[in-house]
Amino acid sequence: MSQLIFNQPSEDKSALEDAGDFTPRFDDRGLITAIVTDAGDGELLMVAHMNAQALALTIQTGTAHYFSRSRGKLWKKGETSGNLQTVKEIRTDCDQDAIWLKVEVAGHDATCHTGRRSCFYRTITLQDGKPMLDIVDDELHFDPQDVYGK
């Protein structure tokens, strides 16, 4: 499979906003933000980043790939845990500088490395004048120790 090549974005704003060529606007590190939701119920699952290779692989294979900023490498989401993300729809915003993936999650139906369905399992509240985190989704779909050995 040959890698997709993305053309440079147009300087013409209307070309970015209309139908036609998909010309993603990667940041100065070569990344684009990816928002990921469940294709069935719309729950926000995660926010990640993609480089051109990850975006191309995602489009070509229908399986979500990302670029790990902390590890500095490409990663196929769910490759270790079995919680692969099958992409049902990809959208971009008006500036083509963010991607929205609607996915179905295989395996344990978990997206977060903590074993939860979503990476957004905590709320931020103000307690005694201090911002604090409260867990609102404590249901583990898998044990990270068993899957990752951590």
UniProtKB/Swiss-Prot annotation:
One of its GO terms (molecular function) is phosphoribosyl-AMP cyclohydrolase activity. Its cofactor is Mg(2+); Zn(2+). Keywords: Amino-acid biosynthesis, Cytoplasm, Histidine biosynthesis, Hydrolase, Magnesium, Metal-binding, Zinc. It is found in: Cytoplasm. SUPFAM superfamilies: HisI-like. GO terms for biological process: L-histidine biosynthetic process. InterPro entries: PRA-CH, PRib_AMP_CycHydrolase_dom, PRib_AMP_CycHydrolase_sf. It catalyses: 1-(5-phospho-beta-D-ribosyl)-5'-AMP + H2O = 1-(5-phospho-beta-D-ribosyl)-5-[(5-phospho-beta-D-ribosylamino)methylideneamino]imidazole-4-carboxamide. Mg(2+) binds at residues 93, 95, 97. Binds 1 Mg(2+) ion per subunit. Binds 1 zinc ion per subunit. Its EC number is 3.5.4.19. Pathway: Amino-acid biosynthesis; L-histidine biosynthesis; L-histidine from 5-phospho-alpha-D-ribose 1-diphosphate: step 3/9. The keyword Magnesium applies. GO terms for cellular component: cytoplasm. Zn(2+) binds at residues 94, 112, 119. Homodimer. HAMAP family: HisI. Catalyzes the hydrolysis of the adenine ring of phosphoribosyl-AMP. Belongs to the PRA-CH family. This is Phosphoribosyl-AMP cyclohydrolase. It comes from Rhizobium johnstonii (strain DSM 114642 / LMG 32736 / 3841) (Rhizobium leguminosarum bv. viciae).
